[in-house]
Amino acid sequence: MKQFHLSIYIIFFALPSWGSNLQNAINEIFPNQIKVYGVKIIGTEITPPKDIKKAARILKQWLDNDGDEKPDNSLVVNELIENNAILAMGKTENDLEESFDSLIDVLEAIDVDVDNFERSLIGLISEEPNIAYLEEILHLVTQVGYANAYPEVFGEFKGSRISKAMDIARGGFFKKTPKVYPENSWYHYYDKSCDYSCMVTEYFYWSLTSLLGAQINRYDEISEERELNTPKKMERDKLMMELLKHKKYQIPKRLPSF
């Protein structure tokens, strides 16, 4: 696999809608920063540069899956940039949480819409295993990129095509997490903190990574949440397979290499 040479350096992000106070806070709280095709990765002071570089390699491969040094889907990348998508990294859970809290304090002090800001931000703990890098970075790409580029298809709301596929996978439409999923379901996430849009985000991740082979040896670990863990089993999810394989959307066809 081609090696990517990436450098970590301070970037003063252009955030005209939020102002210089927020920009300065981001630079102070998350001083280790890099961009991948214009998409921002920011890390706390103690986040190891090697881990930020690893995240950058993964993001680059999710966006440029065919390795031709340009994004596969410019619409998706444009939405990531337009919506100020940010991957925020901390070395440990405590490091990331404290840094988030500090940033939220700044947002509230300068009267920024916290909910709107958080919708475009995904957190990643650098000490987590590789599978977490695949998951959280893909969440950023799908939640901020694909969902905004193709809302009628990948929008994280009832009525989009991916939501219809998910409702089949869950055994029906459930606005809130049910106590028990139907027996015919193969996607049954019981985290009550995960609302309907969150369920769509997770469903996209499980579907794509199962199709690409990331979950083959993890059935015992993940079956309580996800049963279709192999490319062969994914054939059962016909509607989602149509979306994942449609040439128009340029969905990644191979897993990123670490």
Which residues are covered by each model-predicted region?
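Conserved aromatic-histidine-acidic binding/catalytic patches
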Residues: 43-47, 125-129, 189-201, 224-232
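Acidic/His-rich structured neighborhood in mature extracellular/periplasmic domains
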Residues: 27-29, 36-182
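Hydrophobic h-region of N-terminal signal peptides that target proteins for export
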Residues: 10-19
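Post-HExxH zinc-binding segment in Zn-dependent metallohydrolases
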Residues: 146-220, 236
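Catalytic-loop region of hydrolases
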Residues: 22-23
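Sec-dependent signal peptide recognition
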Residues: 2-10
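A general structural signal for short secondary-structure junctions and capping/turn motifs
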Residues: 2-3, 76-81, 194-197
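Pan-zinc metallopeptidase signature
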Residues: 201-258
